[in-house]
């Protein structure tokens, strides 16, 4: 019987091929350097507008991955207000969008702060302010207490592709993850963000929103690596 990755004795001791990934990291660093150089060359107003556009696209695209289409103008307006950017055409934003923006900005603007259980719970509660995901009530602001499976197929003919860590082990697994996240400083930040994203998804600690929070964690490490929330 095939074991899931977290069932192996060496979990979560990740390994990788330095030769393969170093070439990729070199390309990433080159692109990062070009972008940072271009941003530094901009005037204050142009830089603020570029930052606003980049952050807005980040939020919108992240939600699109989950099949959710957010109103671009509402997202843009919410970010502009929170960052104190004066721009024309601000509109009111829904409570749901405000929560998503709040999480993203907390991750990218306060990236020097530790990632804690309390902080993750706050992000999760912000994503689901009503306690519902669509028409379904979910557990918010805490780890899931039920099982989590990735399933496809019609009712009665379901195929289970993946079953996440048992709910009673989520707290234990997350404690390991958070300890590593806050204390592992030897890894290249790009590699660390990749491992963090994968590790978090494997645990799948929440009823819903795990993917969006995983991408916020990745953004947090990216901002830390660049020394900027832009």
Q: Where does each model-flagged region fall?
A:
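FIC/Doc superfamily catalytic core
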Residues: 1-230
